[in-house]
Amino acid sequence: MRANFVDTVMARLDGEVATIWATVLLRLEDRPDVALLRRGLRALVRESERLNVAWNDARRAWVPAVRGDVEVDAVLVEGAEPLSEPDAVARIINTRVDLSRDVPLRLHLHPMVDAAQGPWLLGIQLHHAIGDAKALAHLLERLWLLCAGRGSESRPLEPSTLTDGKVLLAALRQPGRVLGLASPRRRLLAQRGMGLRRSGDTAGHALLATARLTLPQGDTDLQASEVFFSALLAGVALRESPADGRIRLRMPVDLRRMLGLGRTLGNGCSAVPIELSLKEVRARLEAPRELARFLRSEVQRVLDEGVHWTTALECMAVARLVPARVLRKNARPGLIAEPRTNTLVVTYLGRMDTHFTEAPFRIRSMRSHTATWGATGLSFADTLNINTAAFQGLWTREELRDFTERVAGWASSGFGLRAEVLAP
């Protein structure tokens, strides 16, 4: 199975800094039926061609690797010892995998010490080389149906149909998208973003914290995604020194929708750099909705210019032409370069409720994580969860907590939202 340019970059970089999982973390009301989950997982893996592959780095391709029931049963890891949520989360998000051998899917079930928040934690992970968070959401919808014996109600997810060729043809329809590679402002790898102050120069275990904000009912003018992005901008502006600089967000853009490719199991995103002056962000800190509008207009400008096609070409060139040793050699230095290629990698996953309506358990709360220095956001029930991520050795737990508290405090006071922070 041919790997597209996103698969290739993710597989070739995997493990250099961390295992690149797309992770959701669920606090549950009761212990789920493990036998039911394992039956569903067996059926899911049997029908999913893309879960029956292994990465061949020499060929830069997926090769067939049919999974037996024993291998699939090992996907669900049960913990016996009650853990605190920070300890369980740290164990889950730092799980390693070998793409040349292992099933690229993991479920972790842990009993919790602080049972009042939900006595069980279920972590679900899909390796980003196989699919992104959107693909994981679709995969889980399918898993819930298989667990309920209702697999015939929908079709199995097909492997990704996003190919390098389709992206190349779409990009070439407007020559300016190719010429845009000459502009550093339109390149993901251009070192233009201000780096965040850090306490060290090594990237160790992944860290996660969450700002949980209660969304108001009926405020149709307040979009959760805009709260997410503007609160992160504010967190940077409040934390960093007063000197001017560029805040550079790296933000994914879904190409599947633009190319009409539908629901598949795979990677379907390009990414765009969103550059904003720190001075201009600071000037709007007392006017949160104005900051949200300012950010919205900048994102729209970048999309109107087709920068997502330019950066897709850039990523394609890196995936196909750059030797693996060069990719891996530059992964860690890129985190501490000054200026950096990005200040934060940020992803808003959208409203997640619809993907879990058929889940065979009751969910108390939800968080997410991607192994990066940045943040993922999601809405679930009446909450917006801003999940901030970093690495030990760059930030301490206290630094991550401080940044997350600044994000939560600004969003709470600016938009009138009740906030709490979960941090290691």
Region spans (language model):
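Hydrophobic/aromatic-lined pockets within catalytic cores
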Residues: 131, 144-148, 232-241, 300
